[in-house]
Amino acid sequence: MIQQQSLLNVADNSGARKLMCIRVVGGGNRRYAHIGDVIIAVVKDASPNMAVKKSDVVRAVVVRTKKGLRRDSGMSIRFDDNAAVIINQDGNPRGTRVFGPVARELRDKNFTKIVSLAPEVL
């Protein structure tokens, strides 16, 4: 569960390292974001000489959360960290690589490019 002021790791090579959520996209007053939801975030830490700079406002999709995700089969899945991938307006990732595992639910939400770049899909 990601809400405003939540800090997330960045799971791609766009240049950002840490994000802080400033808005959950969708619905009028939506409070929480889960895996596969789009957020608006500000870059809190970034690598030098990369495409994304510190204090940039970006769109990102949540790919991992510490809060467990319950599937229809009854299985529950949770990760060790909260992580997101920075995307552009079209929903494509700004980086060329994705680090760490991502959840299968991203495929259902039409983030197939992120799923194809990920080394492991759980």
Swiss-Prot record:
UniProt-recorded name of the protein: Large ribosomal subunit protein uL14
The entry describes its oligomerization and partners as: Part of the 50S ribosomal subunit. Forms a cluster with proteins L3 and L19. In the 70S ribosome, L14 and L19 interact and together make contacts with the 16S rRNA in bridges B5 and B8.
- Keyword rRNA-binding on this protein? yes
GO MF terms held by the record: large ribosomal subunit rRNA binding; structural constituent of ribosome
Give the matching PROSITE patterns: RIBOSOMAL_L14
Provide GO CC annotations from the record.
Answer: cytosolic large ribosomal subunit
Q: Which CDD domains did the record assign?
A: Ribosomal_uL14
Please give a single GO biological process term from the UniProt record: translation
Q: What superkingdom heads the lineage?
A: Bacteria
Keywords (A to Z) from UniProt: Ribonucleoprotein, Ribosomal protein, RNA-binding, rRNA-binding
Q: Which family does it belong to?
A: Belongs to the universal ribosomal protein uL14 family.
Task: Write down the InterPro entries for this protein, in alphabetical order.
Answer: Ribosomal_uL14 (IPR000218), Ribosomal_uL14_bac-type (IPR005745), Ribosomal_uL14_CS (IPR019972), Ribosomal_uL14_sf (IPR036853)
* Functional description taken from the UniProt entry: Binds to 23S rRNA. Forms part of two intersubunit bridges in the 70S ribosome.
Q: PANTHER family, alphabetically?
A: 50S/60S RIBOSOMAL PROTEIN L14/L23, LARGE RIBOSOMAL SUBUNIT PROTEIN UL14M
Would the keyword Iron be found if you checked this record's keyword annotation? no
Under the heading SUPFAM superfamilies, the entry gives: Ribosomal protein L14
